[in-house]
UniProtKB/Swiss-Prot annotation:
Annotated source species: Aspergillus fumigatus (strain ATCC MYA-4609 / CBS 101355 / FGSC A1100 / Af293) (Neosartorya fumigata)
Cellular compartments per GO CC: endosome membrane; vacuolar membrane
Similarity-based family: Belongs to the SSH4 family.
Gene3D superfamilies: 2.60.120.920
Protein name from the UniProt record: Protein ssh4
Residue ranges of every copy of the B30.2/SPRY domain listed in the record: 146-342
Compartments, record wording: Vacuole membrane; Endosome membrane
Lumenal side of membrane: 104-507
Topological domains, Cytoplasmic: 1-82
Low complexity bias (residue ranges): 401-414
Annotated stretches, region: Disordered: 385-417, 449-507
Keyword Cell membrane part of the UniProt annotation: no
Residues carrying covalently attached carbohydrate according to the record: 480
InterPro entries, alphabetized: B30.2/SPRY, B30.2/SPRY_sf, ConA-like_dom_sf, SPRY_dom, SPRY_Ssh4-like, Ubq-SigPath_Reg
């Protein structure tokens, strides 16, 4: 075979190869030998073959021949198919891992009605009864009795069985007082905690919870409140959260239906009396726990020292939740409903408190602001006049005059004779020389006093008239000790006889 007729790369740059020349010379033999053709016109087929061959060889100008084929297209398709298969495999692997982690970490709260052998495959009542039976086996007598007591209370008083919506009077109280309308009210029968200043709670040595008097409103998007742990021994368990009414207050919040709480151990409880789920860091003295509620979505979340934790409750839209704090030992917790700043900055900026700090009720008027009031002005003037008159009377007289009380009987004239005892009125005038002027002066200078005040008032000054023995000096009337003794009766009679005879002798 000649070089120019050899098949290979040289055939592309030179003359047509042997295969090409043979096809060109005898195209019909090539077609008949290769594949059987259907019964068609032979001339048309021959023309088509010649046209194809001419198109392949007409552009040979000494360079590379532009051969059109499907080699590049098939390579691109192969690469595309490989990439798509790789992405598909990765997607399937990601989906498998997502399903695995979903079933592993979110088993609580799911209800399966099929028989796949996982916990929670029954409905709520059956699952709760099974968990209750398992927990009662490991409880001690005290815990079992407390649980049965709480269970009896819940059965007799189902959650939300009482009217807890904010009434008109409560709404008006909130409008007047603001956030000060909320306060904790301990149960009198339990009496294991003491509330001071509406929001400062002190617990004692047994398990107890305390609720507020008003529920959390539902008008705004978010409501938020905080509780600060002031005193907490290590052995005390504190539970801070939300409950509905009625609730067994001898149990902690979160242990029974429609209640949720953040425990001081770092766990959370939501309608769960048997086991707690890990939630956040443990609480110590000085920590601040916040509770937030979104009424529109029914979501409840917690914060710790100003840092938001994950949501705990979803879909609780219809319940009326009450802020609740409980403990099983001595501790002190102070609650902030919005009367001061929050530790959680977002709640502080967006004003998520239960109500405004100040209500519409005006404070009492300050001292000295009665100048514009006629009633207060008249009362002030009358009081000033009375005090001035009393002061002047006290200065003009050494004693305060107390007028006698008026008799409830008919009014008597001054000339009527009364059988009532007359009060002794000392006089500065002579006895028997009475006059109206003297009586008037005596009345003006005399005070009618109560019997209890007679011992405290000194007697009035008194001087006897001239010539009266009552006014003479007592010491002058006393006999002189140095004078001779008093003569006897006989001597006195003899002296009297001598005195009677002496005038006769003179005559």
């Amino acid at each position: 075979m000649r070089g120019s007729e050899a098949s290979g790369p040289g055939a592309i740059f030179g003359a047509p190869s042997t295969l090409t020349t043979s096809v060109i010379r005898n195209p019909t033999s090539f077609l008949s030998s290769s594949t059987p053709l259907p019964s068609t016109d032979a001339d048309v087929i021959a023309q088509n073959v010649e046209h194809v061959l001419l198109s392949l060889t007409s552009h040979n100008d000494g360079g590379l021949v532009g051969v059109s084929g499907n080699s590049s297209g098939s390579t691109g398709k192969g690469i595309l198919i490989g990439v798509l298969s790789a992405f598909g495999s990765a997607t399937v692997a990601v989906l498998v891992l997502a399903i695995f982690f979903f079933f592993k970490y979110t088993r609580r709260g799911r209800i399966f009605l099929d028989r796949i052998g996982r916990p929670g495959e029954f409905d709520d009542e059956q699952a709760f009864a099974r968990e209750e039976a398992e927990a009662l086996e490991v409880m001690d007598d005290m815990a079992r009795s407390e649980y049965m007591r709480a269970k009896s209370f819940v059965e007799a008083n189902p959650p939300e069985s009482m009217q807890t919506d904010i009434s008109l009077s409560q709404f008006l109280a909130i409008q007047e007082k603001g956030v000060s309308a909320w306060e904790f009210q301990p149960e009198l029968e339990i009496a294991n905690c003491f509330v001071e200043g509406r929001t400062e709670i002190e617990f004692y040595d047994s398990e107890c919870s305390v609720q507020t008097n008003l529920p959390v409103p539902k008008q705004n998007d978010v409501y938020y409140w905080e509780a600060k742990i002031y005193e907490k021994p290590e052995s005390t368990l504190i539970s801070i959260g939300m409950t509905t009414k009625p609730y067994p207050l001898f149990r902690l919040p979160g242990f029974h239906k429609t209640s949720v709480a953040y425990l001081s151990t770092g766990h959370r409880r939501y309608n769960q009396p048997f086991s707690a789920s890990p939630y956040g860091p443990a609480l110590a003295q000085g920590d601040v726990v916040g509770v937030g509620y979104r009424p529109r979505s029914g979501t409840i979340f917690f914060t710790r020292n100003g840092k938001k934790l994950e949501d705990v409750v979803h879909g609780a839209k219809t319940q009326n939740f009450f802020p609740t704090v409980g403990a099983n030992g001595p501790c002190t917790v102070h609650v902030n409903f919005g009367q001061m700043g929050f530790v959680f900055i977002e709640a502080n900026v967006k004003k998520w408190g239960l109500a405004p700090m100040t209500g519409s009720l005006a404070p009492p008027p300050p001292y000295g602001s009665e100048q514009g009031s006629i009633l207060l002005e008249s009362g002030r003037e009358s009081a000033a006049q009375i005090s001035q008159r009393v002061y002047q009377d006290a200065r003009t007289s050494s004693t305060v005059r107390i007028p006698p009380s008026r008799s409830p009987g008919p009014v008597r004239s001054p000339t009527d004779i009364s059988l009532a005892p007359l009060a002794h009125i000392p006089s500065h005038e002579d006895v028997g020389e009475g006059s109206s002027h003297a009586n008037t002066i005596a009345d003006e200078q005399t005070a009618l006093l109560n019997p209890t005040d007679l011992d405290q008032v000194p007697p009035p000054e008194y001087s006897s008239p001239d010539g009266s023995r009552r006014g003479s000096d007592i010491t002058g009337d006393l006999p002189n000790q140095s004078s001779p003794p008093i003569p006897s009766y006989d001597a006195a009679v003899g002296n009297q006889a001598d005195n009677t005879l002496r005038p006769d002798g003179d005559h």
